[in-house]
Regions:
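Short acidic, gly/pro-rich beta-turn/loop elements at beta-sheet edges
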Residues: 23-25, 69-71, 107-109
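An N-terminal domain-start capping segment
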Residues: 2-21
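Short amphipathic alpha-helical segments
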Residues: 17-43, 77-85
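Glycine-rich beta-strand-turn "strand-cap" elements at beta-sheet edges
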Residues: 1-7, 42-58, 81-110
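Short, well-ordered beta-strand segments in beta-rich or mixed alpha/beta enzyme
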Residues: 9-15, 45-77
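Non-catalytic surface loops within mature trypsin-like serine protease
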Residues: 19, 65, 101-104
Length: 110
């Protein structure tokens, strides 16, 4: 019996939208961006912080290793997959993602 794959890499994407469009973007981002990601990443978390004039969205996806992440992004693991309507929703298009090694994980998640 093989043990389940464990994430060693976290890929963090951030984007900002106006407060007026935040609810609409949250639905769009889930349907068009997160759902497909769920099929290939080991895990996905999404976050939203509402501020006075804008809302920030953050997606953290978890990967077995850089090679697995690269199969999703192409040869460059830092490459961003802009969704077709991101220019309409986002205040500015993100230019980079953050990639971190996952050292430990504690507690229940998911």
């Amino acid at each position: 019996m093989t043990s389940p794959k464990r994430p060693t890499i976290a890929r963090i994407w951030r984007g900002r939208t106006t407060r007026e469009r935040a609810d609409e973007y949250e639905i769009y981002n889930y349907e068009v961006g997160i759902r497909p990601l769920l099929a290939i990443a080991l895990g996905v978390q999404t976050f939203r912080e509402d501020r006075a004039d804008e809302s920030e969205f953050m997606t953290i996806s978890y990967w077995e290793d850089v090679a697995a992440m690269s199969r999703f992004t192409g040869s460059d693991p830092t490459r961003i997959h802009h969704l077709p309507r991101d220019p309409e929703f986002l205040i500015e298009l993100p230019q980079a993602v953050q990639i971190l090694r996952l050292l430990t994980s504690h507690g229940a998640m998911g």
